[in-house]
């Protein structure tokens, strides 16, 4: 059953990457195409990452129990913690980002209307998003058993989306500006990279000293 869901997640990610990369709306495939799929995705990324954090919290297996049980063995403490942390790297919640972004970027470049992208900048943008995804991976470990905090986050995110739908608030403008800057100014990849390095060692020290 687990392999079915993994296969389904990969297939859906690939399909959505192709669909969104061509500017087609999944809700209205026969309707008018999205004129600028790249800008559209940058606007929605703040919500996508937020909702994925909630889904990850609900379904991703956290290696805390593995760490605690292994700490009772003669194995070196640092190796145990790194082993458990590195297990999460291969989570399907991380890989679906690859399976979505790769076809999305390919379709962007193939489309004559939207294909005027700097390939190296687009690659850096992809890597930046992947780094952010892995940041949420390790953040999820810290959020273990903090149900109230995650519920509050989910409620706030939903309320913001409702306000945006009713034209009372629009944070997608800021989302587009932030994520587009990762394409426009490639050196900014240092921000998600340094954030990932920081949270990796923060999580490591959290378990090592506690």
Summary of predicted features, one role per range:
Residues 1-67, 77-210:
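Hydrophobic alpha-helical transmembrane segments of membrane proteins
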């Amino acid at each position: 059953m687990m392999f079915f869901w993994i296969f389904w997640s990969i297939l859906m990610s690939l399909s959505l990457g192709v669909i969104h990369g061509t500017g087609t709306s999944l809700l209205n495939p026969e309707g008018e195409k999205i004129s600028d799929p790249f800008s559209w995705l940058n606007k929605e990324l703040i919500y996508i990452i937020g909702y994925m954090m909630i889904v990850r919290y609900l379904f991703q297996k956290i290696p805390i129990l593995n760490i605690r049980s292994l700490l009772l063995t003669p194995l070196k403490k640092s190796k145990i913690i790194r082993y458990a942390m590195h297990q999460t790297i291969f989570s399907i919640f991380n890989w679906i980002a690859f399976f979505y972004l790769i076809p999305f970027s390919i379709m962007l470049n193939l489309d004559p209307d939207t294909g005027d992208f700097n390939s190296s900048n687009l690659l850096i943008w992809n890597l930046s998003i992947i780094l952010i995804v892995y940041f949420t991976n390790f953040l999820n470990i810290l959020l273990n058993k903090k149900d109230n905090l995650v519920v509050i986050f989910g409620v706030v995110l939903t309320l913001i989306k409702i306000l945006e739908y009713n034209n009372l608030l629009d944070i997608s403008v800021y989302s587009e500006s932030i994520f587009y800057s990762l394409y426009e100014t490639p050196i900014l990849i240092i921000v998600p990279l340094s954030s990932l390095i920081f949270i990796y060692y923060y999580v490591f020290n959290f378990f090592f000293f506690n």
